[in-house]
Amino acid sequence: MQENYKILVVDDDMRLRALLERYLTEQGFQVRSVANAEQMDRLLTRESFHLMVLDLMLPGEDGLSICRRLRSQSNPMPIIMVTAKGEEVDRIVGLEIGADDYIPKPFNPRELLARIRAVLRRQANELPGAPSQEEAVIAFGKFKLNLGTREMFREDEPMPLTSGEFAVLKALVSHPREPLSRDKLMNLARGREYSAMERSIDVQISRLRRMVEEDPAHPRYIQTVWGLGYVFVPDGSKA
């Protein structure tokens, strides 16, 4: 799946950039790297990329600000945030503002490769158990989710989704009225096991509820089943 995929690495650590360029190129990706937001902006005016690996702690504009800015511009490029070990608050904030995944430093390049592949699979609409194209539009309340085109609408108004949000929502709507544990959701949406220390599923659920629920504190469509996980209820009735 690596053929023709272009990866942009944004990190001020020159040695890490060189290592990732070499390793990801060996894995079949086209890789460019820059050291800061200014260089990134100049490059993005000339080239497009399938995915960005973005360091949180950058000189000048930091990774959180870059991610927020790109999402405010409706840039759909998936972003994997690179954070320092122990920066849980920053990881959660990164996911809340639209990062698709994160990886803490120090990391094994193989782990980053696995996460890149998982995000690109989601972006390519390759989730297991997906409905066929003929069954690809899911309607609930005022919303329509097109699983084939990865678009969601509130009545006629488009609602942009990150690849992470789409993956979690797709997993839920593909299993209506079936409570899904965090483990199951993580496996369906990200292709890996859930860690008890990880908050990414909860963060994505919170973001989705803010999009589709009139009262996110009392959700109708994405409900919590205590002790079991989360459940999608198409008609908004009690699970």
Curated annotation (Swiss-Prot):
Residues 135-234 bind DNA. Signal peptide: none annotated. InterPro entries: CheY-like_superfamily, OmpR/PhoB-type_DNA-bd, Sig_transdc_resp-reg_C-effctor, Sig_transdc_resp-reg_receiver, WalR-like, WH-like_DNA-bd_sf. It comes from the Bacteria. The keyword Cytoplasm applies. Residues 6-120 form the Response regulatory domain. Induction: 1.8-fold induced by growth in 15% sucrose, no change upon growth at pH 5.6. Part of the ompR-envZ operon. The modification 4-aspartylphosphate is found at D55. It is found in: Cytoplasm. One of its GO terms (molecular function) is transcription cis-regulatory region binding. Phosphorylated by EnvZ. Asp-55 is the primary phosphate acceptor site, but Asp-11 may also serve as a phosphorylation site, particularly in the absence of Asp-55. Phosphorylation stimulates the DNA-binding ability of OmpR. Dephosphorylated by EnvZ in the presence of ATP. Keywords: Activator, Cytoplasm, DNA-binding, Phosphoprotein, Repressor, Stress response, Transcription, Transcription regulation, Two-component regulatory system. Changing D12V: Very poorly phosphorylated in vitro, produces OmpF at 0% and 15% sucrose. SUPFAM superfamilies: C-terminal effector domain of the bipartite response regulators, CheY-like. GO terms for biological process: phosphorelay signal transduction system; positive regulation of DNA-templated transcription; regulation of DNA-templated transcription. In the presence of 0.2 M NaCl, 2.0 mM sodium cholate (bile salts) decreases expression from the ompC promoter; how this is mediated is unknown. It holds the Pfam family Trans_reg_C. Composed of an N-terminal response regulatory domain joined by a flexible linker to the C-terminal DNA-binding domain; the relative conformation of the 2 domains alters upon phosphorylation. Cross talk between this and the Che and Ntr two-component systems can occur at least in vitro. Member of the two-component regulatory system EnvZ/OmpR involved in osmoregulation (particularly of genes ompF and ompC) as well as other genes. Plays a central role in both acid and osmotic stress responses. Binds AT-rich DNA. Binds to the promoter of both ompC and ompF; at low osmolarity it activates ompF transcription, while at high osmolarity it represses ompF and activates ompC transcription. Involved in acid stress response; this requires EnvZ but not OmpR phosphorylation. Phosphorylated by EnvZ; this stimulates OmpR's DNA-binding ability. Is also dephosphorylated by EnvZ. Monomer in solution. Up to 8 OmpR molecules bind to the ompF promoter; each 20 base pair (bp) region of the promoter binds 2 molecules of OmpR, which may only interact upon DNA-binding. Binds to direct repeats in the 20 bp DNA fragments. At pH 7.1 protein is monomeric, as the pH decreases to 6.5 and 6.1 about 70% is dimeric, which is poorly phosphorylated. DNA-binding ability increases at acidic pH. This is DNA-binding dual transcriptional regulator OmpR.
